[in-house]
């Protein structure tokens, strides 16, 4: 399938500012209230520079509502509903977040997808009503609906909200996860097909989506080089001061569906003089990892986004030891851009999505090769290579990404 990407002269648009005065509603799997960076947050923030944006947090499901073990973000949302607090909160100029007050039913366990769809329609109606109430209060009209990979909560919102444009943003292969695949194998192709426009952050996903919708566009990916700036000095993080050279570092969620524990174990075993530092929250599927038995593997936990550059700066080599599966095959590895923006040598698993990074990274096809490439990366370090990496990452800007998104939106609104 041909991957669509609009040329600047295809529509009369030259920059992001050309998308102005629109009312945009965004739904996402990533709630705004979590202090975690995401593509959708970056897109929302930039859209709000010239448009009004309502960022809709995920509705709380029944199972979570009755649970006594709520995390801080969910507890905040729960308390707002329970205490009849303000459901709309100003994030910044032209941007608000919505805490939906409706509780939706927990239905992923249902074996029948047809039954799931019927109850999911009722769930979507509840969410749609919350959104309608919010856009009425804010005075939004003729909305554009941007769905950030939320297949279930956004499945019927095109019909229920009648937006001027329904955009589906595909940036993750959810069908590869056990939780999602039961109903996602049916629902995502249907959602892609009925979306007015599909945009993706990788060429692989654009090709995948174009099977179901010819209006599928690769819009690129941005990297926040204002945060990940390899040209400034950083203090050594306190919890890394006693970790000796060479430090091989990873930042991001520790997820057994994405990370290959065997690669990390091979590095720890074969390169015993090295220290492997893992910075990020542990998902439930990683909590009992056998990697804890290695004395040279360090788990430093979740860090705020603004803290990550100091950790990356302290790494001698950055690693992305992904497991090869349907989830990682086409997933754009944003962390690679962040590593390169800091000028760091990078060793990563070779995947389809990593092909574009090959001239600036060391790509491994096996655990044993990973160790050899780390040693090569350490030996070849130079200011020249560091600057080439920074320049390459710097070419992946959110401005370019949002310009492309703006072109797509304006093209389809004018049809």
Stretches found by the model and what they are:
Residues 43, 126-136, 181-198:
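Membrane-proximal helix-turn-helix segments that form the acceptor-binding/catalytic region
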Residues 382-411:
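A charged, aromatic-enriched C-terminal amphipathic alpha-helix characteristic of glycosyltransferases
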Residues 240-258, 268:
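Conserved donor-binding/catalytic core segment of Leloir-type glycosyltransferases
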Residues 155, 195-218:
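A short, active-site helix/loop in glycosyltransferases that binds the activated sugar's phosphate group
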Residues 204, 219-225, 231:
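Carbohydrate-associated surface elements
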Residues 34-38, 306-311, 318-340, 348-359:
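Nucleotide-sugar-dependent
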Residues 286-310:
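Nucleotide-activated donor-binding/catalytic signature segment of Leloir-type glycosyltransferases, i.e.
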């Amino acid at each position: 399938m041909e991957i669509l990407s609009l040329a600047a002269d295809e529509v009369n648009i030259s920059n992001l500012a050309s998308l102005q005065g629109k009312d945009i509603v965004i739904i996402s799997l990533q709630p705004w209230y979590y202090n975690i960076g995401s593509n959708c947050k970056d897109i929302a923030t930039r859209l709000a520079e010239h448009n009004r944006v309502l960022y809709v947090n995920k509705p709380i499901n029944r199972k979570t509502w009755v649970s006594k073990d709520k995390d801080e973000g969910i507890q905040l949302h729960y308390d707002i509903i329970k205490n009849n607090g303000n459901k709309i909160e100003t994030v910044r100029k032209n941007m608000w977040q919505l805490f939906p007050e409706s509780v939706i039913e927990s239905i992923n366990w249902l074996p029948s997808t047809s039954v799931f769809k019927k109850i999911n329609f009722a769930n979507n109606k509840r969410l749609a009503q919350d959104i309608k109430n919010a856009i009425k209060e804010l005075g939004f009209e003729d909305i554009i609906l941007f769905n950030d990979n939320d297949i279930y909560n956004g499945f019927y919102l095109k019909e229920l909200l009648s937006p001027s444009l329904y955009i589906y943003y595909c940036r993750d292969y959810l069908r590869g996860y056990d939780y999602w695949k039961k109903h996602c194998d049916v629902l995502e192709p249907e959602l892609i097909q009925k979306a007015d426009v599909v945009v993706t952050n990788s060429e692989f996903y654009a090709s995948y989506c174009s099977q179901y919708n010819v209006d599928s566009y690769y819009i690129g990916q941005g990297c926040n080089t204002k945060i990940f700036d390899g040209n400034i000095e950083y203090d050594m993080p306190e919890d890394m001061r006693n970790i000796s050279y060479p430090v091989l570092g990873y930042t991001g969620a520790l997820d057994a569906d994405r990370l290959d524990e065997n690669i990390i174990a091979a590095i720890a075993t074969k390169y015993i003089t090295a220290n492997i530092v893992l910075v990020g929250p542990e998902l439930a599927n990683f909590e009992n990892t056998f990697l804890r038995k290695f004395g040279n593997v360090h788990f430093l936990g979740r860090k705020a986004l603004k803290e990550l550059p100091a950790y990356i700066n302290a790494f001698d080599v950055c690693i992305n030891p992904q497991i090869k599966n349907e989830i990682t095959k086409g997933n754009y590895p944003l962390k690679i851009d962040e590593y390169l923006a800091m000028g760091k040598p990078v060793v990563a698993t070779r995947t389809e999505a990593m092909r574009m990074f090959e001239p600036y990274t060391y790509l491994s096809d096996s655990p044993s090769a990973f160790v050899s490439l780390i040693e090569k990366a350490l030996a070849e370090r130079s200011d020249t290579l560091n600057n080439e990496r920074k320049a390459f990452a710097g070419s992946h800007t959110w401005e370019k990404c949002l310009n492309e998104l703006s072109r797509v939106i304006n093209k389809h609104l004018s049809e």
